[in-house]
Regions:
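Acidic, Ser/Thr/Pro-rich regulatory low-complexity segments at or just upstream of the first helical elements
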Residues: 1-109, 120-130, 144, 149, ...
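C-terminal region detector
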Residues: 210-225, 229-416
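Structured all-alpha helical bundle cores of eukaryotic regulatory proteins
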Residues: 54-269
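Residue-identity detector for glutamine
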Residues: 10, 27, 67, 90, ...
Length: 416
């Protein structure tokens, strides 16, 4: 059964009611980073923290950079770095910095790790060589470590519903509506031309709203509809064109129908247009292309670098402590196992010794019983028991001869 958006982790865990809720989460992450840097062990004093607004500015710059990377790479190979990867990667980036501060994790590394992870999730071939060292002076292992921290911050909730897919579905529905109005002749040529022109314009508007907080406050299908309506309103002719998008939205979604089937009370047409207009008016908080903003970005970046370096030092020390503690636990387990093995070996040796003594006693008992039986048999037959007699030896060690034998030796004569 197809799961609705409202039942997804994206809706349950990564959608917020207002911009104030997002600001509160970012402020909490900022304060946690300041505390972490201030309470670090060691003699080195931490660099002064940057304001939260400056951290948000540097994040906005790298969100814009992420879209540039996708567009440049997609121009070389249209099958890679598609809009699906763009939206998924930017969603990862936004979610990460809801719970982390750019003072403790370099946004450039997170941007590249988001793209690399999004390629896996969206099943597009993006390899490390596409990202490093082309876009950052990072070792591949360092980027893989950032990817792991990214997944941990995302709580491994990696499936992202994209407005680009919803936009394609809406355009197909609009095309069917226009064709039905044309009757047997089908959609008129001007309507088809306008539909074709609406698609790239709507995509651009989706990309623009991605730079704002809209993906964290509105479902993707509503983002797609707002982009389509905004593109139609901004197109030449607007409502005077061959297609009336507002009339189609009113007919399609203004009644009992809803963008999300699980929505309990679909909004009225008036309320829906109000929501779509608010989404379309959401703009990025910072114009990172402006000259004055560029200068501010350079200053913020120079202040962030020592903070990130200090945070890495803290993290490295923490990892070393954890590794040392884990090694101590392993040594303790090895020693405990060694003691158990020695105790088991001692117990086995004791058992072997007991068995040996029992076998020796049993053998002695059998020999004693056999000797007694032989003596009794000899006595019954009138025989002397067998006795071993030891011969005497002379001083030279030779056996002493009997007297008759000695006399016989003396009487031997040798004749010439």
């Amino acid at each position: 059964m197809f799961a609705t958006f409202s039942s997804s982790s994206q809706s349950r865990c990564w959608m917020f009611d207002s911009a104030d809720a997002l600001t509160a989460k970012r402020q909490a992450a900022h304060e946690a980073a300041v505390t972490k840097l201030a309470n670090a062990e060691g003699d080195d004093a931490p660099p002064p923290p940057v304001p939260r607004e400056d951290g948000e500015l540097i994040c906005a710059f790298y969100e814009s950079k992420l879209q540039e990377v996708c567009k440049d790479e997609n121009a070389r190979d249209p099958k890679r770095f598609t809009n699906r990867v763009l939206y998924t990667a930017q969603s990862y980036f936004k979610r990460f910095y809801l719970n982390r501060s750019p003072m403790v994790e370099d946004p450039k590394g997170v941007m590249l790790a988001s793209l690399y992870l999004a390629g896996k999730v969206e099943e597009e071939r993006i390899v490390l060589a596409d990202l490093v060292p082309k876009y950052a002076k990072l070792q591949e292992q360092a980027l893989l470590a950032v990817e792991l921290r990214l997944m941990e911050a995302l709580r491994f909730q990696l499936v992202v519903r994209s407005p680009f897919r919803a936009l394609t579905g809406l355009l197909h529905d609009l095309h069917a509506h226009v064709s039905a109005e044309g009757g047997a002749a089908g959609a008129p040529a001007p309507a088809l031309a306008q539909l074709e022109a609406l698609h790239p314009r709507a995509i651009d508007r989706v990309c623009t709203c991605l730079k704002a907080d809209a993906p964290l406050m509105h479902p993707p299908q509503r983002l797609a509809l707002a982009a389509l309506l905004g593109a139609w309103d901004a197109s030449d002719g607007g409502g005077a064109g061959a297609i009336d998008v507002r009339a189609w939205i009113t007919r399609r979604f203004g009644g009992d129908a809803a963008l999300d089937p699980a929505e309990p009370e679909p909004p009225s047409a008036e309320k829906l247009f109000e929501q779509l207009g608010a989404i379309d008016q959401l703009a990025p908080a910072h114009d990172v292309g402006a000259a004055d903003v560029r200068e501010r970005l350079k200053a913020v970046d120079s202040r962030l670098k020592p903070l990130i370096k200090h945070a890495r030092k803290i993290e490295k020390a923490r990892e070393e402590r954890l590794a040392a503690a884990e090694e101590a636990k392993r040594d303790e387990r090895r020693q405990a196992k060694g003691g158990e093995r020695r105790a088991d070996a001692h117990k086995i040796l004791q058992q072997v010794e007991e068995l040996r003594q029992e076998a020796h006693a049993a053998a002695a008992a059998r020999l004693g019983a056999a000797g007694d039986t032989n003596a009794e048999n000899a006595a019954a037959a009138g025989e002397q028991p067998f006795v071993v007699r030891k011969r005497r030896r002379n001083d030279d060690g030779a056996a002493a001869a009997s007297e008759p034998a000695a006399a016989a030796v003396k009487s031997v004569k040798f004749e010439a």
